[in-house]
Design a protein with these regions (language model features):
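Transmembrane beta-strand segments of Gram-negative outer membrane beta-barrel proteins
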Residues: 139-176, 194, 198-204, 240, ...
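Outer membrane beta-barrel
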Residues: 218-312, 426-448, 596-612
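Extended, structured, electrostatic nucleic-acid-contact surfaces
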Residues: 61-82, 98, 104-110, 125-126
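Bacterial Sec-dependent N-terminal signal peptides
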Residues: 1-34, 691
Length: 691
């Protein structure tokens, strides 16, 4: 213990020294913005736990790798960039309409309301190209001749052994068949993609998670296979999707299997529906399988979609659905028995009519399972969806003008439950914007594919008012602030009575020099929680208080060397139990020589938390299409290094090594995931071939 304490003290001293050394830097190089920084600032602790944000990350990564041509860009494409406000999108399109094609990205500073940070972020996702004829029908021979293809493969190698990979006697496995994983410990994925400009896409994704069997009796190939074809903007046809696809209409009350804005991201954009999108990620839930079509008839866009998909579920002895399984793991006989054991058939329509700044839409969805969802015996689930068929419909509406933007949707679910969400964005000036949002989701509202703005993560049993402000206080100082007051009319998990809460955030970004950037975020949340005595008798509700602090310093030492220092601090307070807290201090460095052949990202961090409840989330650089937003608790150290080498215009190699050392335990994890030791070392490899 004495050696560990001494080691911890030394590590803290090292990181504090690095922190102040970074503060003392006074360089003369331009501040570097990356889309990784954008994701980190838009993502909260709650957001990163949802698969939809992994899809969002994949989409951003793909746009970054295949940027839009600014001279042919559409409003729908601009809306996929989460840092653009509705008014700025209109201003970009208006500039193109009045001034014609852009000659260089330097013209962005001439667009009305275009601030410095947005000018730095946009070149990560756009380029200046030739103006093309819109909605032209491409010839098949041109598609095949000029289309671009890509093969991307990834291999994760854990340099340790979990309990699920140990050898056990046959007698033990006969009694406990789920004690051992059926496959090896490697995780492997393979992606093939083709695209012809922004009009034609197709691809195939194959994935095998750690522990899953492959190329054997249990799985003849990979555990997960996905294929898609997407065609956009051909004549009157807006979009045609075949295979796996995702949908997002309105504010997400009826249909949204794409990502939903968190409270921080709401300050940057409005998050209107994006329509039909291909599903090319390795996420094994949140997508449809079938056909979707969007067609333009006058000023109305008509979208039709049909899906017949197999889903994972937990079934009882009567083969009724008790819950859906969304983690995609099929490592043991028990997990494999839940694979694709329920079929879900879905059909729907969406209409969107536009006129003079107004958009009026209507969505109707019907879906049916081959078995029924069982009524839960848990009191807080008394109003949850039951049965095997569901019908949901809603109306969404948008009004855009120079001074204000109004977005909303109102929906009705099976059984008459209602939901509504409405937001008003006031553009007070070029520097100040206010946002007011009201939502009311009844306790008996059922929409199985809804994903909208909420506190509890579901579109049910919630009412709240959100007030936010986005302020450019000066040329170098930006501030974002919000307060969200919410209540639940019915019970929630571990909340045995109607409850209420409040969520407050203040976020500041300061760039005093072109080489220095400072970022600070404070978040306070109060939510009611059950109080019980030593005999587990319910005594009532009491507030649990959470404080979250994050500070970040960015510094460019040279055109090729970039430093980032992060400090996270969490504190939880509940009744007289005192408080538990945790912090994470890290230093990251990025090196990219002028030749652009190689790039190195490395980081080191020390974490110390009192409990799992005070765990700290942190984002670190990783491989392409790898969403790396992980949590740490206890006491330990995290090291990682990522190397990217662009061997040529065709080949790219990436490798990442991650090392986690715990000072407060001799084992990591539990059950099949248990590691005998205090170390976790992982190796990640990736190869990309473009042709």
């Amino acid at each position: 213990m004495g050696k560990n304490s001494q080691r911890s003290a030394e590590l803290r001293s090292i990181f504090i020294f690095l922190f102040f050394v970074t503060f003392s830097i006074n360089a003369v190089y331009s501040q570097t913005y990356t889309w990784d920084d954008l994701v980190m600032k838009l993502t909260s602790e709650e957001d990163c736990e949802y698969d939809s944000w992994k899809n969002f990350y994949d989409d951003l990564c793909e746009i970054h790798d295949n940027p839009y041509n600014i001279n042919t860009i559409t409003k729908d494409q601009l809306e996929t960039l989460p840092f653009l406000t509705p008014q700025l999108i209109e201003n970009i399109l208006y500039y193109q309409y009045t001034h014609g094609p852009m000659k260089s990205l330097g013209e962005l500073q001439l667009v009305e309301d275009m601030d410095y940070e947005t000018r730095q972020l946009l070149p990560l996702f756009i380029y200046v190209g030739e103006q093309e004829k819109k909605n032209a029908i491409p010839k098949l021979k041109n598609i095949l001749k000029y289309g671009k293809q890509e093969i991307l493969t990834r291999l994760d190698v854990p340099l340790y052994r979990k309990a699920g990979y140990m050898e056990y006697p046959d007698s033990v496995l006969a009694k406990y068949p789920n004690r051992k994983y059926m496959g090896n410990s490697l995780h492997h994925s393979l992606r093939y993609s083709f695209h012809y400009g922004t009009k034609v896409f197709w691809g195939l994704t194959a994935d095998k998670d750690s522990g899953e069997p492959a190329f054997g009796k249990a799985n003849s190939t990979y555990d997960y296979l996905s294929a898609y074809v997407l065609i956009k903007n051909i004549g009157r046809m807006n979009t045609l999707a075949l295979g796996n696809y995702r949908l997002h209409y309105g504010q997400g009350l009826v249909m949204n299997t794409d990502f939903s804005l968190g409270k921080t991201a709401m300050l940057s954009t409005a998050g209107t529906g994006k329509g039909i999108k291909k599903h090319s990620s390795t996420s094994e839930s949140g997508y449809f399988k079938g056909i979707a079509l969007s067609y333009k008839v006058g000023k109305t866009d008509v979208s039709l979609f049909y899906s017949y998909n197999d889903r994972d579920a937990n079934l009882d002895d009567s083969l009724l659905i008790t819950s859906f399984k969304t983690d995609g793991n099929h490592r043991t006989p028990l997990e494999l028995s839940k694979k694709h054991n329920v079929t879900d058939e879905l059909a729907g329509i969406h209409l969107d009519y536009s006129f003079k700044g107004f958009h009026l839409g209507a969505t109707a969805v019907y879906n049916r399972f081959n078995t029924s969802i069982k009524k839960s015996s848990q009191p807080y689930k008394a109003y949850d969806a039951i049965g095997n068929s569901f019908c949901t419909s809603g109306i969404d509406y948008v009004y855009n003008s120079h001074l204000l933007n109004f977005y909303g949707e109102t929906a009705i679910g099976q059984g008459g439950g209602m939901a509504t969400v409405n937001s008003l964005h006031l553009n007070i000036s070029e520097r100040y914007k206010l946002i007011l949002l009201y939502r009311n989701y009844s306790k008996d509202y059922h929409a199985l594919f809804a994903n909208a703005f909420s506190e509890g993560g579901s579109v049910q049993n919630e009412e709240g008012i959100y007030l936010g402000a986005d302020m450019k206080l000066s040329r170098t100082l930006n501030a974002k602030i919000y307060v969200d007051c919410f209540r639940s009319p019915w019970l929630r998990y571990q909340v045995s009575a109607p409850s209420k809460g409040i969520d407050f955030l203040s976020q500041f970004s300061w760039v005093p020099l072109k080489s220095i950037g400072l970022f600070f975020k404070y978040r306070f949340k109060s939510k009611e929680k059950d109080v019980k005595d030593e005999n587990n008798n319910w005594l009532g509700l009491a507030n649990k208080y959470q404080h979250r602090l994050q500070g970040q310093l960015n510094a460019n030492l040279s055109p090729s060397l970039f430093l980032q220092t992060d400090l996270y601090y969490n504190q939880n307070i509940f009744l007289n139990a005192g408080h538990d807290s945790g912090y994470f201090l890290s230093q990251q460095v990025s090196w990219k020589p002028i030749s652009n052949i190689c790039k190195v990202d490395a980081g080191a961090g020390y974490f110390h938390t009192d409990s799992y409840d005070s765990r700290v989330y942190t984002y670190e650089k990783s491989l392409l299409y790898a969403f790396s937003f992980t949590s740490f608790y206890g006491e330990g150290m995290r090291l990682y290094c990522t190397v990217r080498v662009d061997c040529s215009d065709h080949f790219m190699l990436m490798a990442k090594y991650g090392h986690t050392k715990y000072f407060d335990r001799s084992t990591i994890g539990s059950s099949n995931e248990k590691i005998n030791g205090s170390l976790k070392n992982d190796l990640y490899l990736q190869l990309r071939y473009k042709f």
